[in-house]
Amino acid sequence: MVFSTTAALSLLLALSSMQLSEVSEACTCMPNHPQEAFCNSDIVIRAKVVGKKLLKDGPFGTMRYTIKQMKMYRGFSKMQQVQYIYTEAAESLCGVRLQVNKFQYLITGRVFDGEVYTGVCNFIVPWDRLTLSQRKGLNHRYQYGCNCKIKPCYYLPCFVTAKNECFWTDMLSDQGYMGHQAKHYVCIRQKEGYCSWYRGAAPPDKTRINATDP
């Protein structure tokens, strides 16, 4: 009986340890180019956080941020105005921490049951850290490229498997995934039907796009 109790306690501790490990390591995000973050989001807004409230405590709690929306870039079909942003309270579950009354943020998220949810795997960054190219991308360029696919390249050589793909090679540089392509380029379909990187001062038109490989 003593052996059984000891074994049961050991098993319980082991399972508890595994569960805690799973929770602490649950938040793993694949890098996203800002264009894909834009295209894969239901909502993309520029906003300032003006308040926060913990709705549910504990490891599976929810944090609600009250925001002042400055501009919406994507999501008009879902809602016209966003007042609250929801995220997991625990950082281990990909909850994001936003500063109140400090920054304007670019916030991307998904809509569930009429509410906007976001987390560290979404593209969230203080507005003043965005490059001019990224800001232009939000206004029109990223939308033009939503029918293209940005394919991360971690090791050379990389191979295109479809004509709608652009290689994302920032991970091969010292800057990592927020390198030159993420900061300055958008992947756009050309009139010939294939996608390639674009960078320019003027918005790309739909009939002729000057593509530039970074």
From Swiss-Prot:
Can you cite an annotated GO cellular component?
Answer: extracellular space
| Span list, region Involved in metalloproteinase-binding | 27-30, 91-92
Its main subcellular localisation, reduced to a broad class, is secreted
Mind telling me which InterPro entries this protein's record contains? Answer: Netrin_domain, TIMP, TIMP-like_OB-fold, TIMP_C, TIMP_CS
Q: Name one GO biological process term.
A: response to cytokine
Q: Which domain of life is it from?
A: Eukaryota
Sorted UniProt keywords? Disulfide bond, Extracellular matrix, Glycoprotein, Metal-binding, Metalloenzyme inhibitor, Metalloprotease inhibitor, Protease inhibitor, Secreted, Signal, Zinc
Residues carrying the site annotation Involved in metalloproteinase-binding: 40
Disulphide bonds in the chain? 27-94, 29-121, 39-146, 148-195, 153-158, 166-187
The signal peptide here is 1-26
List, in alphabetical order, the Gene Ontology terms for molecular function in this entry. Answer: metalloendopeptidase inhibitor activity; protease binding; zinc ion binding
> Which residue ranges does the record assign to the NTR domain?
27-146
Provide the binding site for Zn(2+). Answer: 27
- Asked if the record carries the keyword Glycoprotein, the reply is yes
Expression by tissue, per the entry, reads: Expressed abundantly in brain and cartilage.
Gene3D superfamilies registered for this protein in UniProt: 2.40.50.120, Tissue inhibitor of metalloproteinase-1. Chain B, domain 1
Q: Name one Pfam family in it.
A: TIMP
Annotated SMART domains:
NTR
**Chain's role:** Complexes with metalloproteinases (such as collagenases) and irreversibly inactivates them by binding to their catalytic zinc cofactor. May form part of a tissue-specific acute response to remodeling stimuli.
In Swiss-Prot or TrEMBL terms, this protein is called: Metalloproteinase inhibitor 3
